[in-house]
């Protein structure tokens, strides 16, 4: 993600160094995770807990890759798993484990889809002073994060228009502007266009 490398450079080349970074969904945020791994070894993922009801977090990219491979599929087919993971003691344990990780983290990475669902369980005490990385941050999300005590919001989607537009809209605009047929562009090509146009990511200070 060019946006994160740009921010790292712009904010003194040490903003993400050794930061404790928590991902609500590593599978949805793989690109961000790979970039953050360049600056910090302290990456934690909640995929196993939130997807499969396992009261244990995933530490590091290698463990995430193991989970995202065959292990995740196997867990989805474990007989009787739901009887255990849906029990109140297990759900309480998962909520406690995830909340502790959120509280200890400096940076939270939140997918655009399911944004409010991920954050609704948490209070100002949990999110106060955090940096949030997400995409396509509309005004209602800025107000929501402000009320939660978040210090910094990093919107990885550059703002091309007067109103915030989603990633798919921006990709469509770039394809038309540079005469790129749908399906021919790669992520690297779109990233190069964004970099050459010097479109800065949004850094928002809601408080």
Task: List the predicted regions and their residue ranges.
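N-terminal basic/disordered segments at the start of proteins
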Residues: 190-207
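Conserved mixed alpha/beta catalytic, RNA-binding, or beta-rich assembly cores of soluble enzyme
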Residues: 1-189, 200
